């Protein structure tokens, strides 16, 4: 049996370790993991997507992107012959971006984001108060390992300035009804995961492991 190649793209600042709990049947699928590259000076999202597409070495592959990685794989699709594009905890157009992000975009307040904080998560962890904050910072420390200042500033800007207004009807969208970054009320035409937050690639991995193969193979999916 010819196995289906599935390429996974993590979210903003995340490494492919966020997919460590994802398992697809080895009889049907081969899993490949993409990593963020440092953008070139003044590189557009389109140019970056074209460069990232070179890491996909199979025709008719499946692209799976999380959050900003979901935006990227939609742009990469322009340069590849793909079987499917699946986005998780992401958006299909800038119309699905919440109002607070649009305000940040219009005021250009994103240029004031202290990316140095993301570069020094270990320091934040030392001075954090409360077990919940420390637990979340430990998660960030483990999974958000891409902390290059050039990359962080570029990625935040590209996410906020994404100019797509028409959704690609072939893109399959999986979204949690408790997503705090991209609220479900703004999302159209998606497979809803009950209780899924923005990090459901970790917290809802059992649902994803059960249903992602079905989605790829066009089988019926459980939506609760």
Predicted features by range, described:
Residues 173-175, 179:
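Short beta-strand/loop motif that positions the catalytic acidic residue
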């Amino acid at each position: 049996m010819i196995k289906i190649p599935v390429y996974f793209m993590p979210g903003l600042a995340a490494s492919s370790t966020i997919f460590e709990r994802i398992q697809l049947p080895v009889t049907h699928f081969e899993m490949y993991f993409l990593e963020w590259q440092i953008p070139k000076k003044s590189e557009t999202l389109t140019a970056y997507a074209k460069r990232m597409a070179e890491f996909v070495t199979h025709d008719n592959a499946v692209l799976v992107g999380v959050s900003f990685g979901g935006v990227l794989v939609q742009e990469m699709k322009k340069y590849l012959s793909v079987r499917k594009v699946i986005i998780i905890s992401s958006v299909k157009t800038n119309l699905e971006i919440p109002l607070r992000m649009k305000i940040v975009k219009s005021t250009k307040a994103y240029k004031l984001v202290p990316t140095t904080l993301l570069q020094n998560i270990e320091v934040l962890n030392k001075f954090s108060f409360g077990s919940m904050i420390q637990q979340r910072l430990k998660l960030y420390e483990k999974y958000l390992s891409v902390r290059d200042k050039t990359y962080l500033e570029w990625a935040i800007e590209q996410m906020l300035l994404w100019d797509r207004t028409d959704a690609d009807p072939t893109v399959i969208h999986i979204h949690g009804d408790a997503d705090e970054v991209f609220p479900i009320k703004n999302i159209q035409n998606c497979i809803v995961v009950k209780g899924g937050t923005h990090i459901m690639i970790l917290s809802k991995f059992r649902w994803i492991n059960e249903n992602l193969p079905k989605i790829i193979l066009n089988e019926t999916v459980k939506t609760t």
